[in-house]
From Swiss-Prot:
NCBIfam families: alaS. This is Alanine--tRNA ligase. The gene is alaS. It is found in: Cytoplasm. Catalyzes the attachment of alanine to tRNA(Ala) in a two-step reaction: alanine is first activated by ATP to form Ala-AMP and then transferred to the acceptor end of tRNA(Ala). Also edits incorrectly charged Ser-tRNA(Ala) and Gly-tRNA(Ala) via its editing domain. It comes from Coxiella burnetii (strain RSA 493 / Nine Mile phase I). Its cofactor is Zn(2+). It catalyses: tRNA(Ala) + L-alanine + ATP = L-alanyl-tRNA(Ala) + AMP + diphosphate. It is an enzyme of class 6 (ligase). GO terms for cellular component: cytosol.
Amino acid sequence: MNSNQLRETFLNYFKQLDHEVVPGSSLIPENDPTLLFTNAGMVQFKDVFLGVETRPYQRAVSIQPCMRAGGKHNDLENVGYTARHHTFFEMLGNFSFGDYFKRDAIKFAWDFLTNVLKLPPQRLWVTVFQDDFESESIWLKEMKINPERFSRCGEKDNFWQMRDTGPCGPCTEIFYDHGPTISGGPPGSAEADGDRYVEIWNLVFMQYNRDAKGNLLPLAKPSVDTGMGLERLAAVMQGVHDNYDIDLFQYLLKALRTLLKTEDLHNTSMRVIVDHIRSVAFLIADGVIPSNEGRGYVLRRIIRRAVRHGYKLGQEEPFFYQLTKPLVEEMGGAYPLLRKSQALIEQTIKQEEIQFSNTLTKGLKILDHEMAGLPSRQIPGNLIFQLYDTYGFPPDLTADIARERDFVMDYAGFDKAMERQREQSQQAHQFVANYAQKASIGGETQFVGYETLNSQANVISLLQNDQPINRLNESEKGVVVLDRTPFYAESGGQVGDQGFLYFEKGSFRVKDTKKQGDIYLHIGEMLQGHLNVKDKVRAEVDVSRFDIMRNHSATHLLHEALRRVLGERVMQKGSLVEAKRLRFDFSHAKPLTPEELQAVERLVNQQIQANLLSTIEVMTPEEAKKKGALALFGERYGKEVRVLEMGDFSTEICGGTHTERTGEIGLFKIVSESGCAAGIRRIEALTGKAALDYIESAEQQLRSLSDLLKTNRKNLAAKLSQILEDHRKLEKELAKLKQRLASQQLESLINQVVDVHDIRTLAIRLEAVDRETLRAIVDQLKQKLGKAAIVLATIEEGRIQLVAGVTKNCLEHFNATELLAPIAEKVGGRSGGRPDLAQGAGERPENLEAALAAVPKWIEKKLKE
């Protein structure tokens, strides 16, 4: 039975038992900052188990994609080296929320395994918690399993709890016995760590609530949470012991074999790569992008680990992204989002591969060099940190290399180096946090800025230089905290408001507004007079707020327009809303075409012209989702959210300030579209008068260009095309002249060739040529000389240009990049390229002649190595 059939069989079995088939949730847990990734089927039902959420069903069945890389549950360093560790796996699970309990859960599991899947009972082994006599009785007396294939285990193995307090309970586990040819004893025995008995299903019975004192109190409605790994079950059903031998992995391994032109499907690096493409693809499909923090950093680590293992197999060019296609072929039917996101996944992985490949070789050389000189077999923490900080080597990638060479890692030293860096970076980020900590003495601020731009208020706290003060004097800078304010605090991409606080005989200029918890911090400078705690003020927001409102409303229209033009997979990844402009970051695999940009811009302006009414409702996050409101990826929402609707065009959760009608935006103009990260595009745009000014400026430039080219605007494109075509013709003529010049110099250069053993060698400076001409001459010399190493140089506008060429029959001794590197270094520059052709540049012409003169000796030394 293949994996697709197993998924279908499992869902159908429990569907017939009145279970609601619930789609697996995202790998990114919703509203749960305690979890980095979804790591079990019960995660999406956590609030149901806790009693804070109700569902219209009491029985559920799901197939949940899960991650175990990063955080508490981290299998990354073992992946590829064992038969069953994976970064990504699928969890089959059935759940009861106060409906059936132990008897039915056990009966369903046993029936599915023995009657539906036809697994022989004599190959199964059952464990229960040592004090769970009810489950023991059900197994032995009702299911009548063989008592010799049954054991009791302690709390460590057979008692489950979500955290130190809360729902918990005993569990019963079902193991598959792979037979006596594999080492290991039954669960609960001293030999239980072997691989013979493999857990395939865990049934958790949540029947207690553990209080803060550790007491177990019975739950009013006991529940069931079960989990069974698809990969392990597939191994059992397909008669193999190693998960990498099942259909899912074999399909990917064979695709990788073709890609890398290798035959060893059991190679550890091959296994690492095919495991990692699954977790990487699903994470990107769920909206994660490579970065240097949080989930994005875990994704980056996994990609880089796969790339490094490809490098071990001799693959130095980007290859990992090409496994996306076979993965989609194998799993796209079960997970349509994977198929829908294929282009984004490929583009994101490829960009990350290219970026990392630039530093991988250098980092490996440094590590090789340092390891060769270490006095012990421990890699120092400062070296691990240097590789991480300078060359992007995640510590687990260095640990992989250490493991392969029988070295250990100095993690304590690495942690100290990391801590030093954190302390340095945190010093620059204490401003707002310190103010908020001091301001918390003063209470909270009521925000009234949705209804008005000015209000009366009382000063409840003043701060200066991180310290609470009672009085702020003229010309002094500080922070004012009010009991109520119309000033919007920086949040959700919208900048903080500016304006003034007016009071008797004085004023305070608010330059920025920030928020910490319920405290609004009005940051600025006293213009005149003095201000005391408990004084009354009139708070007035600057009229620039209207421009901010226009731009914020425009971002909502832009977001929806992008989804309609490019597809619903587009997700917001960030934004900046200020008075002068707006910036919007979104997930998309490639640059937008001019036609797509035009369609987006036109669609936004159509909604502005339609003058749609903006309405706001306050509701729970669950109600907002049912309404179809878009939520910002990764945002954690409170009990209530504001939902902004613009006609029937856009519905989003948003706490920002907006125009009452879309017509108030006036005009929308996209001024740039660019990439800001792998798989992330950025649009910058203007609205209102700023957009009109931009268009008028563009019109003026067109008029000036038309005058310059002596044509009207209607014929401007044709005129420019003709000029460019003439330019291309001239460039071709110039190239021919350069080629002719190269040919003319060829005979003279051949006469200056010296023989270093059997390698014809030339290292010389040429005058009045450019780099392209140097390349042409190198190519012709390689053809003429047979077995040759050539370095040509010229000085162009005060800067040295270098080109080196090596014929193929020299590559067993050295290549062009190796040949050119010391020369470039001597002239204060850098070089790079292919094995047969390298290029470089330098800044020290005075060292050039000596550097070229050293080439024959360098070659002679290489030949002796």
